[in-house]
Amino acid sequence: TIQNENSRDFIGHIGGDDFIIVTEFERSEELAGRIVKAFDEIAPSFYGKEDRARGYIISTDRQSNIQKFPFLSIAIGIVHNMLRPLASFAQVSNIGTELKKAAKKKENSSYIVDRRKD
């Protein structure tokens, strides 16, 4: 866990492997960076020595084909209302989903900040 000094932050579980953190925009990138760094430091410990040496795991995919898979990573989307108004939770959720998908396309753990004004 990341130690968080701001008692006004809210951390919640949306479902599956999705979580939400509500924080001040000014702290969001610093907090996301700390989460990414902490996650990437601990993730290799979930794997055996051989997998860590290789840098990936070998396993079967959903079609029973043997594949190489990267280690776990974390993708964070930062949604805020500093550049445009947000009208509903559904809008926040949709933007968050878009950002998370974009962050997952990167090779390693990452975060993306919504910078759109429309």
Which residues does each predicted region cover?
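Conserved helix-loop-beta segment at the catalytic/binding core of cyclic-nucleotide signaling proteins
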Residues: 1-30, 37, 44-56
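A short glycine-enriched loop-to-beta-strand structural element that forms part of the catalytic core
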Residues: 10-13, 47-97, 110-116
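A general structural signal for short secondary-structure junctions and capping/turn motifs
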Residues: 24, 66-70, 102-103
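Short, conserved charged micro-motifs
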Residues: 27-32, 86-88
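Regulatory helix in c-di-GMP signaling enzymes, encompassing the GGDEF I-site helix
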Residues: 35, 93-99, 103
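Conserved, well-folded catalytic cores of nucleic-acid-processing
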Residues: 42-45, 99-102, 106
